[in-house]
Structure formats: structure tokens, C-alpha cells
């Protein structure tokens, strides 16, 4: 369901010098132990211009750990480790792939669901379901230029049916992936509406070639990048993201992600809904030089063990499923799960599905975000073995705080101050 919210309580992104708040350490909640040196948001004026996008369920999505991990490697242009590449090849050869993020024949029921966001493009509006991705900066879609052999039931954008579409002369786009595949095409300017807010002249990248990994995702019609515009791939002139184009129409240049475990979440643009989180919001600075929402975590904690202080540079990425961290962190975590091991036949860490899985906490300054153990159990790969939601970032070169982590908190992406805000919330 898609709707526009215009009269929610808005909290200013301007912060005070002190903050206090509750600490949440239970495996059933996301914890933010809020210290006095962190920043709190005071109540502000009524929000004037903002909107909400509620995700929609994709009923055919079933989790596959190896394929989710492989997708992250491809996205960040990293070669797949040999073990993982072999697993992906075997799954593909066996015909077990129903989607790029996969399903495993031995476990056909749904374990979690990918959620997409409806976006209207053109006049009259053509509705496509897109993946909101803070790890990229292109709004690209399947289109009538995409060969039939590269489509698999996706809804396509047809610029010829939009009275507001115009071809951007000489402009092309291309995104390459770590497995050597790519997606590319031409560019149109058109009206794009998200959550009831319309912007004109938005760059819409129409695919004429699509990577097989996207072709197999039959319900995914494209991506809406929410990274910084400096990594947009349009040539010869980069184009702005939808968020950057819409900034001038928003009360505040920010959006929030309130993703959920096993149900649809939502994105709010232009305002912070005070009812969506508990306690206060802790902010940390963002390094946008590489176009990502990149921040430095202050460390980690496994279950009730002591917090380990360690600077870990990572990206808050709504377009990546798993939590990918350095090997030392990963091995420390799985050493606390009976029967856990690196399984070369799966290309990642697995453990008995019956095992007790501890929570995982990461630091944001002096605050703490706790991911429940139930979130860390990503999906079964057999009737008795499960694939972990935490995997190694080896070969990628940076840590990725994907949906496994983001679902455990209310997250603010402030494009004005270039900060990420983290707050506790009630978890499902």
C-alpha cells in the first residue's frame, strides 16, 4: 500500500549536545545504550512536506544464503570466492533458482520475504516495484528496450506511452558486477512519483541489457538508488538521484528506513516520525566520498560477552541482505554457536538450526545496536542446517550493514548534515 503522509510530527535533525536513553540488550529488542555524549533530537515544528512509502510483499521470495551472499559480492564488484562460486554454479545448474536471491528445493516454504516499493513513472503513471537501495545511485528499470530473452515477467517502463518522457540525448548508463556481468541502457527524463510526491525531469535509466541475476528476479522491476549522486553511472553527465532531485520539496533533506523482520517496513522522506522509535537518536558522521552511506562502527559484542572496541568501517546498505564483517568478528561470533562452522559446500558459515543463536551488537559511538539472535539465523539450507545472517566481507574490502542489521533499528539518512542516525524501536 502506498500513501502520502503530510501531518506527522516532525523532529528536527538539529541536535542538542547531550542525550540520555534506555539500554536494550535483550535478544528480542534492538538496543541503543545512549550515552551523555551522544546527540538527542528535540521536538520540532509540525512537518509540512514529507511522505511515506510502505513496502509491498513479494509473495514468491524465498531466502537462499549462498545466493544472497553472492549478490553482495557482485554488487561491490568483488570476485566470488571459489567455494561460493561453485555453490552458485551448482544451484544454477540444478535449476533450483527461482529468483536471484533464490530458493532451495529441499525447503520450499517461505522463510522471509523480500519487500519492494511501488514507484510511479511517466504520464499517465506506470507503476513499477523497485528496490530502494542506499548502496547505489541509479534509478534504472526494465523497459521496452530490454530484450524479451532478458525479461522474466517484470513490469517494464514504456517511454512511448508517457507524454512527459524525453530521451536524454547521448546519455547512456552501465553498471558492472563482480562476476563480469552488467546492466546498461539509455536515459530518459520523466516525471517520477514516490509516496505521492512527484518530481519532474528525473533521470530514468531504461535497461537495454540486464544481468542474468536481475532477469531471474521476476517481481523486481528495477532499482531506485538512494546513495550519493557522485556515483551515478550516467555518462557523459552524471544525473541526480530521486532523493537529491526531491530535496528542495522536503521539509528536511533526509529519509528514514524502518525495515521489519518478516513483514513490510516503510521509508519516510522529509521528516522523522517520533512514533517510530523509542528513546533518542544517536548520530554518526558519514563519509560520502565513495558515494555510500559509509560510517565507522566503534566495535561489537557477541551475546552477553564484553564489548570489543574496534573501529569497523562499513556501509549502511538497504540493498544488501546480509551483515558482512571482518573475518575476526565473524569467527568470534560463530565460536559461540554449538556446531557452527565454515561450510565450503555452502560458501559461508552454517550451524544446526536447533542451536541457540546469540544476539550480535555493534557500536555507533557510545551507543549500542543489538540484533536479536533470531535475525542472525538467515535461512535453512536443509532440514537441519541453517545459513548465518553474518558472513565474512573478505574480498569486498569494506563491511556491509545490510538488512539483517538495519531491521534491528530505526535509521535516519540525513543528506543535509551527512549523518546516519540510529535509534531503538519495538521489534517484531
Model-derived features: positions:
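A short acidic-Thr-Gly-centered motif at the start of a beta-strand
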Residues: 111-126, 292-311, 392-393
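Signature of the N-terminal lobe/flap region of pepsin-like aspartyl proteases
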Residues: 101, 109-208, 336, 361, ...
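Aspartic protease catalytic domain
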Residues: 41-62, 66-70, 74-77, 210, ...
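Disordered propeptide/prodomain
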Residues: 20-128, 284, 414
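Aspartic protease core domain of the pepsin/retropepsin superfamily
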Residues: 194-290, 383-428
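Short hydrophobic beta-strand that contains or immediately precedes a catalytic carboxylate
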Residues: 114, 119-121, 128-132, 139-141, ...
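Extracytoplasmic, non-cytosolic globular domains
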Residues: 273, 312-353
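Classical eukaryotic N-terminal signal peptides for Sec-dependent ER targeting/secretion
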Residues: 1-29
Amino acid at each position: 500500500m502506498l500513501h502520502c503522509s503530510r501531518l506527522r510530527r516532525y523532529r528536527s535533525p538539529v541536535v542538542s549536545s547531550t542525550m540520555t536513553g534506555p539500554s536494550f540488550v535483550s535478544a528480542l529488542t534492538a538496543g541503543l545504550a545512549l550515552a551523555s555524549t551522544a546527540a538527542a533530537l528535540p521536538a520540532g515544528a509540525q512537518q509540512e512536506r514529507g511522505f511515506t512509502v510502505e513496502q509491498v510483499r513479494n509473495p514468491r521470495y524465498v531466502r537462499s544464503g549462498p545466493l544472497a551472499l553472492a549478490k553482495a559480492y557482485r554488487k561491490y564488484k568483488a570476485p566470488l570466492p571459489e567455494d561460493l562460486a561453485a555453490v552458485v554454479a551448482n544451484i544454477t545448474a540444478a535449476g533450483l533458482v527461482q529468483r536471484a536471491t533464490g530458493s532451495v528445493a529441499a525447503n520450499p516454504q517461505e522463510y522471509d520475504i523480500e519487500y519492494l516499493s511501488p514507484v510511479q513513472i511517466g504520464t499517465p503513471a506506470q507503476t513499477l516495484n523497485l528496490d530502494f537501495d542506499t548502496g547505489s545511485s541509479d534509478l534504472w528499470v526494465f523497459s521496452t528496450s530490454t530484450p524479451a530473452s532478458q525479461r522474466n515477467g517484470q513490469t517494464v517502463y514504456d517511454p512511448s506511452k508517457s507524454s512527459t518522457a524525453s530521451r536524454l540525448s547521448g546519455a547512456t548508463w552501465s553498471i558492472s558486477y563482480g562476476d563480469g556481468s552488467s546492466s546498461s541502457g539509455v536515459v530518459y527524463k520523466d516525471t517520477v512519483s514516490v509516496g505521492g510526491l512527484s518530481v519532474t525531469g528525473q533521470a530514468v535509466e531504461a535497461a537495454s541489457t540486464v544481468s542474468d541475476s536481475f532477469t531471474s528476479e521476476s517481481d523486481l522491476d528495477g532499482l531506485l538508488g538512494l546513495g550519493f549522486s557522485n556515483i551515478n553511472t550516467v555518462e557523459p553527465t552524471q544525473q541526480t538521484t530521486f532523493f537529491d532531485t526531491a530535496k528542495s520539496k522536503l521539509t528536511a533533506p533526509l529519509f528514514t528506513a524502518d525495515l521489519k523482520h518478516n513483514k513490510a517496513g516503510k521509508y519516510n522522506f522529509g521528516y522523522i516520525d517520533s512514533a517510530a522509535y523509542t528513546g533518542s537518536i544517536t548520530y554518526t558522521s558519514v563519509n560520502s566520498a565513495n558515494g555510500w552511506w559509509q560510517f565507522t562502527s566503534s566495535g561489537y559484542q557477541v551475546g552477553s560477552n564484553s564489548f570489543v572496541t574496534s573501529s569497523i568501517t562499513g556501509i549502511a546498505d538497504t540493498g544488501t541482505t546480509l551483515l558482512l564483517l571482518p573475518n575476526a568478528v565473524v569467527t568470534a561470533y560463530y565460536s559461540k554457536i554449538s556446531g557452527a562452522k565454515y561450510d565450503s559446500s555452502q560458501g559461508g558459515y552454517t550451524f544446526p538450526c536447533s542451536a541457540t543463536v546469540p544476539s550480535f551488537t555493534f557500536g555507533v559511538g557510545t551507543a549500542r545496536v543489538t540484533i536479536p539472535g533470531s535475525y542472525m539465523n538467515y535461512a535453512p539450507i536443509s532440514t537441519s542446517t541453517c545459513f548465518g545472517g553474518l558472513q565474512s566481507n573478505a574480498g569486498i574490502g569494506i563491511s556491509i550493514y545490510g538488512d539483517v542489521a538495519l531491521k534491528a533499528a530505526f535509521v535516519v539518512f540525513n543528506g543535509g548534515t551527512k549523518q546516519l542516525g540510529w535509534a531503538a524501536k519495538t521489534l517484531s
